[in-house]
């Protein structure tokens, strides 16, 4: 368990390698399971990767696509991760995949209802593709919040970041550790510094990504691009 680190000089080569690894995992997992489930992270960073994955010649009709996390906003909003996946991943060949939303089409102000909706519709992913912020957060598990530390068995947790906008729904540490594999994609010198600190210091309260990298339950394959 723990992690494996793969380093690349640029993002193009990094995404190429990650795309090949994704294909390998996808095809191998389908041999073991009748249907596979894969969760994707949002944000601006993975757009080019999502576009590359969307054109892969895979058995997408046997794949369930879900989100690692989502902001509690209308799913047509530009900051919505749901919109991001529909715009960049669920296109081309990947349009044949089925999408499992974290939020209903009509967003209410009742966060408990949204929390219940997300957990009721949750399907445990075989693979989750993660990103990481310069503050060490992953999914929507942020520093100085308690959501990622709880030992309860919810698959989806409600988080309220201190230094980021919007309340969010996020896969819990428990759900992430129940994946067969995790991929972490990061780039840039600053994030490399955060990664190295997380690898040296298992301090999940200040660096949530450390909780994942030091997991005894799941291996994280880290794809790092220098530029």
UniProtKB/Swiss-Prot annotation:
Family note: Belongs to the glucosamine/galactosamine-6-phosphate isomerase family. 6-phosphogluconolactonase subfamily.
Alphabetical list of Pfam families matching this protein: Glucosamine_iso (PF01182)
Function (record text): Hydrolysis of 6-phosphogluconolactone to 6-phosphogluconate.
UniProt name for this protein: 6-phosphogluconolactonase
Annotated organism of origin: Helicobacter pylori (strain ATCC 700392 / 26695) (Campylobacter pylori)
Any one GO molecular function term: 6-phosphogluconolactonase activity
GN (gene name): pgl
Pathway terms, separated by semicolons: Carbohydrate degradation; pentose phosphate pathway; D-ribulose 5-phosphate from D-glucose 6-phosphate (oxidative stage): step 2/3
NCBIfam families from the UniProt entry: pgl
Keyword annotations: Hydrolase
Enzyme kind, highest EC tier: hydrolase
Catalytic function, reaction form: 6-phospho-D-glucono-1,5-lactone + H2O = 6-phospho-D-gluconate + H(+)
Record-listed E.C. numbers: 3.1.1.31
GO BP terms, alphabetized: carbohydrate metabolic process; pentose-phosphate shunt
Entries under SUPFAM superfamilies matching the protein: NagB/RpiA/CoA transferase-like
């Amino acid at each position: 368990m723990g992690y494996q680190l793969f380093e690349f000089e640029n993002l193009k080569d990094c995404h190429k390698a990650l795309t090949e690894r994704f294909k390998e995992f996808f095809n191998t997992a389908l041999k073991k399971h009748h249907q596979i489930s894969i969760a994707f992270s949002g944000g601006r960073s993975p757009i080019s990767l999502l576009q590359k994955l969307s054109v892969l010649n895979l058995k997408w009709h046997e794949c369930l696509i879900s989100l690692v996390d989502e902001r509690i906003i209308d799913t047509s909003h530009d900051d919505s991760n749901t919109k991001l996946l529909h715009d960049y991943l669920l296109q081309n060949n990947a349009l044949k995949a089925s999408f499992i939303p974290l939020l209903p089409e009509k967003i209410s102000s009742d966060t408990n209802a949204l929390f219940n909706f997300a957990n009721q519709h949750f399907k445990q992913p075989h693979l989750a593709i993660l990103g990481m912020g310069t503050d060490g957060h992953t999914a929507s598990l942020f520093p100085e919040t308690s959501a990622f530390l709880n030992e309860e068995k919810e698959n989806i947790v409600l988080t309220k970041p201190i230094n980021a906008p919007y309340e969010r729904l996020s896969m819990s540490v428990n759900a992430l550790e129940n994946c067969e594999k995790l991929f972490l994609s990061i780039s840039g010198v600053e994030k490399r510094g955060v990664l190295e600190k997380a690898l040296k210091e298992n301090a999940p309260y200040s660096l949530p990504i450390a909780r994942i990298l030091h997991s005894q339950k799941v291996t994280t394959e880290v794809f790092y691009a220098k530029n």
